[in-house]
Every structure is written in C-alpha cells, then in structure tokens.
Amino acid sequence: MKQHPAPPYRAGQVLGLVALIAFAGPALANKALAEKQGCLACHAAATKLVGPAYRDVAAKYTGDANASAILVQSIRNGGAGKWGEMAMPPQKQVSEADAKKIARWILDGAK
C-alpha cells in the first residue's frame, strides 16, 4: 500500500496546537493555584466581589516595573487602603514562589 505524505497544513495545525498548550498550560495552572489558595473566594477576573476584580488590579499596575513585587507583598502580607475600606488579610500560607505565579497570572489578565 502506497503511503502519501501528510499535507503541508498538518504541520501548521500541529505547531498551533503545541503553542496553544504551551501558553494555556501555565495560565490554567496558575488559575488553579489561585483557586487552591482561596483567592477566588474574594476576587474574580472581571467582577468586584469582596476584593477588586483582577482586571482592575492589572489595569492599576500597567506599566509599573514593580507591579509583581507589590502584588506578591500584598498577597503574603495583606494590605489596606488600596481598594477601599476592606483590608486584605495576610495569606502567609502562600509561598513566595506561588505568590509570584499568582501575581504574574493577575497581571497577565487572569485568564
């Protein structure tokens, strides 16, 4: 039986799928991490709950070179006065490494 080479567009489809998995994987993992750490009990991507919406947080820190460090500190140490009267309690159970992943996810649009 004669075998025919795969059509050239197949390579593009495969590369596209690999790229999708490569970029979506970390985002999904970081959303799951935020959920596991309890962040989504008070925050949502696009809606203010107890705390600000993540899109509003990302917008506030757009262009700020220290944004990630500020968010990591807020996650781990809590904070007050940035988003109204409700204070964010410290989340000491969140490791520095996990706080960095969550901060990056928030700044990237929390998708």
Question: What are these regions, as identified by a protein language model?
Answer:
Residues 3-16:
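Bacterial N-terminal signal peptides that target proteins for export
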Residues 64-73:
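Post-signal/leader-peptide non-cytosolic segments of secretory proteins
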Residues 41, 50-61, 76-103:
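Axial heme c-ligation environment in periplasmic c-type cytochrome domains
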Residues 28-45:
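Sequence/structural segment immediately N-terminal to covalent heme-attachment motifs in c-type
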